[in-house]
Amino acid sequence: MFSGARGLHGWILEFVKLYKPAFYISNAKYLPRLMYFFRTHQLNPLQFKFIFSRKGLNAYADVLLCFNGHPYKEESKPVKDFSGLKIYHLMDYTYFPKASNEALLAGGVDFVFGYARHDLYCPFFQAKYPNFRGKVIPVPFGFADRFQEKVPFADRKNKVIALGAVNSFSDPVHTVPDFQKLNDFYLSRGEKFMHKFRRMLVEHEEEFSEFMDSKLPHYPQVKDFSYDMVQTFNEYKMFVSCESLQYFPPAKAFEGPAAGTVMMCSDHPCFRDFDFEDGVNCITHKEFDLKDFQSKVSYYSSHLEELEQIQKRAGQFVRERYNHSAVARHVFDEVSRVCSKN
């Protein structure tokens, strides 16, 4: 289903290239954007089928996939009278959750893609999308080709780097109507920062300076785009990840190892679901436990042979499993699996 969405994950483009799905054009006004999409990504429109009517869609397709996100928007609302299986990617499901959930239900959506098993791990999702428990298909971000190992392990700083956003529920960027329900939900639970562990690290930057460097923004700043992510990864042996209070592995969980940097993350099962294993292809610490985090950094920074073996296994692991083509094939397999059962 195409409605003129501006951006897309790299694996979605690979999915289009690999499987040549038909495109359902929800409104003719999106045709110029579709042509721009094809031209930008050097796709041959003659290799694809285009469908412009609900009747044609029902006659041709068994499954309707939508990667637009924002189902509450008119251009992305689910096609209610499509008789086949409907699977929608929620993307950032924190935007206007009530309207999004109502649109999914009204449109008869059967399953949703998510960045992890949100129905098991994210209390916000559980509260706002109760009808989709057991109906979430987890899809990892994967990593772009630019994330390459450029600096040998031995030449990197023997420290951990903390980087990424530190979103809050009260900063100027997020105190907008889109996030009102999200902010209210977590503030009522006594939480101030979406990236809770990163905020804990910010508060201990000086104390941890001997073993940790930090590029984490300080409130009210929540993001920092002033540095090159690939270059920064290549400067360090380890980096620290954060699953946020939404509990999903961020893109950095795949990008960092692809760039040759060992991930340190919590022992939350959202990482294990994607086959990250402590001491094998990552290093885990107890959730929100700074003492355990410090202990793990101390151990591996003095056991570099073990750390280098983890680095090698992790790099091979993510390059085989989480390149965009591999993620696209995973999505196709998951859709096929769901179809066979419904």
Residues covered by each model-derived region:
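Generic C-terminal helix-cap and adjacent flexible tail
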Residues: S336-N342
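Nucleotide-sugar donor-binding catalytic core of glycosyltransferases
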Residues: M1-A253, M264-D275
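Conserved acidic donor-binding segment of nucleotide-sugar-dependent glycosyltransferases
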Residues: C282-F288, Y299-L304
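Acidic, glycine-centered active-site loop in nucleotide-sugar glycosyltransferases
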Residues: A99-S100, F274-I283, S295-K296, R313
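Short alpha-helix at the nucleotide-sugar/activated-sugar donor binding site of glycosyltransferases
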Residues: G256-A258
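A charged, aromatic-enriched C-terminal amphipathic alpha-helix characteristic of glycosyltransferases
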Residues: S302-S336
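Short amphipathic alpha-helix in glycosyltransferases
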Residues: K86, V160, C282, V297, ...
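Phosphate/pyrophosphate-binding active-site loops
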Residues: T261
